[in-house]
């Protein structure tokens, strides 16, 4: 896809529904008793994989664009799938679903695409095995395909080596089916969509700053869920609005969950002109409008506790840093190596192709700004949606057009991304 520089970006867009919350709304609706309705669901490939997997386990789900209805009959109504549960490209689907399958008295096999086959699963399968699930696969359950025989689980106190909402959620979902209480403790607080949604579906949890506990045997009740816009998708337009000259972009109804707003903190730290207008609506997840305008940016050091709050935004932050005065350092982000691609390598290689002064480090990267991006190169998403969208924003800045390969990857989380970008763009 050939893309060229724009003179400015102006207008208002509605960001598609949050991917993390969309996944969970379907899963919890499938486990609940009664009907669950979901508004502003994200109909991207990843979330559609979640729907397909639960349909295979006998759950009746109607999906019409961004409206979804799940006719739940309780967790005990899930039935043994008669074929492979295929998660496609979705790490959230496989890791959370493993927590559910761990407590079900049947056999299932779970796998996904080539990217999923490379992603580490032991971080989830190990605590589930400790609880009593039988899980096997390549490298002793470390990689897909995975075979799961669920059964009687016992609650555990699990100390996670990394702050990961996927690990925490998998163990808590298993804990709902276990005897006794299950507690997960993390080094820093990860995103808390699971805890908020369990509350919305009627479950009781005990929480501290870095831990969450559930007691087994609780029943979930169907709920009405509004999914706010995905801040990880909004991040691309926040960055674009900050660095493309003469821009002003309004993003409507974006999720403002404090465990996800690291991008907003970084933009403010870098000196961006950003206004946050919280919604007054009563909702399990806070949300509001964001207004971003072009401004001069300065470099920042990004690391420590903020990393779990912006791990998915690091590719676009790297691009942002090319347009900031000084050297930006991103550290404590080794988790990037086990995303859809090794995002340290792919961000560095693709941004270098278009003229960025960027170098990889063991746990992040250093970006030297402010730099004019020459462009005039062939670049690729490497099958990673967030790299594809980062390059889409980069094309607005490059002196010469760039040709972006493998743009279909963006359908995972933001099928209308380029449509929205073109809607805002004033061409040179």
UniProtKB/Swiss-Prot annotation:
Binding-site positions, phosphoenolpyruvate: 19, 91, 119, 166, 343, 386
Binding site for 3-phosphoshikimate: 19-20, 24, 164, 166, 312, 339
Classification via Pfam families: EPSP_synthase (PF00275)
GO molecular function terms attached to this record: 3-phosphoshikimate 1-carboxyvinyltransferase activity
InterPro entries (UniProt xref): Enolpyruvate_Tfrase_dom, Enolpyruvate_Tfrase_sf, EPSP_synthase, EPSP_synthase_CS, RNA3'P_cycl/enolpyr_Trfase_a/b
Keywords of the record: Amino-acid biosynthesis, Aromatic amino acid biosynthesis, Cytoplasm, Transferase
Cell compartments where the protein resides: Cytoplasm
Alphabetical GO biological process terms: amino acid biosynthetic process; aromatic amino acid family biosynthetic process; chorismate biosynthetic process
EC number: 2.5.1.19
Pathway field: Metabolic intermediate biosynthesis; chorismate biosynthesis; chorismate from D-erythrose 4-phosphate and phosphoenolpyruvate: step 6/7
Residues of the active site: 312 (proton acceptor)
Catalytic activity annotation: 3-phosphoshikimate + phosphoenolpyruvate = 5-O-(1-carboxyvinyl)-3-phosphoshikimate + phosphate
Enzyme type, top EC level: transferase
GO cellular component: cytoplasm
Family the UniProt entry places it in: Belongs to the EPSP synthase family.
Known partners and oligomeric status: Monomer.
HAMAP family referenced in this protein's UniProt entry, alphabetically: EPSP_synth
Record's function text: Catalyzes the transfer of the enolpyruvyl moiety of phosphoenolpyruvate (PEP) to the 5-hydroxyl of shikimate-3-phosphate (S3P) to produce enolpyruvyl shikimate-3-phosphate and inorganic phosphate.
Protein name: 3-phosphoshikimate 1-carboxyvinyltransferase
Organism: Bacillus velezensis (strain DSM 23117 / BGSC 10A6 / LMG 26770 / FZB42)
Top-level taxonomy: Bacteria, Bacillati, Bacillota, Bacilli, Bacillales
